[in-house]
Amino acid sequence: MRPNFSKGLLPAIVINEETKEVLMLAYMNEEAYEKTLKTKKTWFYSRSRQTLWNKGATSGHVQHVKSLYLDCDQDAIVITVNQVGVACHTGEKTCFHHKII
């Protein structure tokens, strides 16, 4: 089974394999997906810069891919990772650190 990239980008939810914490949400195009499969490190597509980026390439906070899951409609991906360092560019452990309720 493969993701359906017919509409372009797919949301990719990244989860810490050990703690099950949601670390971040990013977007993948087909090229980012293929690079992720090949390298076993996360690659995403930046909507603002319109280019691929490898998580941790600059900061060293890489994500080693442990598994990928595809949803029932083949239009969303969950990636479990071994996170090195923090996930959020703000320096927080996770991008989801603002509790609402």
UniProtKB/Swiss-Prot annotation:
Domain of life: Bacteria
Entry's cofactor comment: Binds 1 Mg(2+) ion per subunit. Binds 1 zinc ion per subunit.
First-tier enzyme category under EC: hydrolase
Tagged with keyword Metal-binding: yes
Keywords attached to this entry: Amino-acid biosynthesis, Cytoplasm, Histidine biosynthesis, Hydrolase, Magnesium, Metal-binding, Zinc
Obligatory cofactor(s): Mg(2+); Zn(2+)
Binding site for Mg(2+): 71, 73, 75
A single GO BP: L-histidine biosynthetic process
Metabolic or biological pathway, per its Swiss-Prot or TrEMBL entry: Amino-acid biosynthesis; L-histidine biosynthesis; L-histidine from 5-phospho-alpha-D-ribose 1-diphosphate: step 3/9
Molecular-function GO term, any one: zinc ion binding
Reaction catalysed by this enzyme: 1-(5-phospho-beta-D-ribosyl)-5'-AMP + H2O = 1-(5-phospho-beta-D-ribosyl)-5-[(5-phospho-beta-D-ribosylamino)methylideneamino]imidazole-4-carboxamide
Binding, Zn(2+): 72, 88, 95
EC number in record: 3.5.4.19
GO cellular component: cytoplasm
Main location: cytoplasm
Annotated localization: Cytoplasm
HAMAP family named among the record's database cross-references: HisI
Membership in a protein family: Belongs to the PRA-CH family.
Entry function: Catalyzes the hydrolysis of the adenine ring of phosphoribosyl-AMP.
Oligomeric form and interacting partners: Homodimer.
Name assigned to this protein: Phosphoribosyl-AMP cyclohydrolase
Annotated source species: Bacillus cytotoxicus (strain DSM 22905 / CIP 110041 / 391-98 / NVH 391-98)
Gene: hisI
